[in-house]
Amino acid sequence: MKLDRRLVIKILEEKIKSEGIVLGSDILKVNSFLNHQIDPFLMSQIGQAFAEKFSHENISKVLTIESSGIAPALMTSLQLQVPMIFARKHQSRTLNEEFFSASVYSYTKQTENQIAVSKRFINPGDRVLIIDDFLANGQAVQGLLDIINQAGASAVGVGIVIEKRFQAGHQLILSKNLPLVSLASIDRFEDGQVVFSKQGETSHVN
C-alpha cells in the first residue's frame, strides 16, 4: 500500500509542535523522538517516505553522520534494500584502515569535527543518497558531499527530516543542483513556538 506522505508530514509536525523545545532564535530540541529517544514507528514511516520519493534514483548506498541521522537513514536503507553507512565523528581505534575524511563545523555545539568513512564502503560508481535529521547551515551535508566526491561516487539526493528554512543550508544544496526533500520545513521560531513553512514539505526532485 502506498504511503500517504502528507499524513507522515502532519504527524511529524505535530510531534515537533507538541514535544519540540525551542532554544533561543535558531535551535530546536527534539530529544523525545529523534535526537535521544527514538520513535521507531515514526522513523519507519519517514524512511518509507524518503525511499518512495527517491525510488527512481537507482541508489546503491545511504549515507549519514553519527549519531542522530542513523535512525532515519537506517529506515530509508531498509526500504531501499541497500547498505547504510554512517560517517564517524571521532576516529575509533578499530578504524585503522584507510578512510575518506572531511571537516564539519557544528553551529549548535560550536565545535569542528573530522568525520570519516572507510574507503572499503564507498566506491567509484556508487549512487549515494544522503539522509540527515536536521538541515541548518548545511555543513554536515557539505562534509558528506566531500567524502562522496573523494570516493569518486555520485550524490543523487538529500533527504532531511527537519529543515530550518531560514538558515543557509537550503540554498547551499540547491546551488549544487541536488534533489532535496525536507519533510518538515520550518520558516521561523516565534515567541518560543515553531512556525512551519506555508509551502509544507520542501521537495526539489528531478
From Swiss-Prot:
GO terms for biological process: purine ribonucleoside salvage; xanthine metabolic process; XMP salvage. The keyword Transferase applies. It comes from the Bacteria. Pathway: Purine metabolism; XMP biosynthesis via salvage pathway; XMP from xanthine: step 1/1. It is found in: Cytoplasm. Converts the preformed base xanthine, a product of nucleic acid breakdown, to xanthosine 5'-monophosphate (XMP), so it can be reused for RNA or DNA synthesis. One of its GO terms (cellular component) is cytoplasm. Gene3D superfamilies: 3.40.50.2020. Keywords: Cytoplasm, Glycosyltransferase, Purine salvage, Transferase. Its EC number is 2.4.2.22. Belongs to the purine/pyrimidine phosphoribosyltransferase family. Xpt subfamily. This is Xanthine phosphoribosyltransferase. The lineage of its organism: Bacteria, Bacillati, Bacillota, Bacilli, Lactobacillales. InterPro entries: PRibTrfase_dom, PRTase-like, Pur/Pyrimidine_PRTase, Xanthine_PRibTrfase. 5-phospho-alpha-D-ribose 1-diphosphate binds at residues 136-140. PANTHER family: HYPOXANTHINE/GUANINE PHOSPHORIBOSYLTRANSFERASE, XANTHINE PHOSPHORIBOSYLTRANSFERASE. It holds the Pfam family Pribosyltran. It is an enzyme of class 2 (transferase). Homodimer.
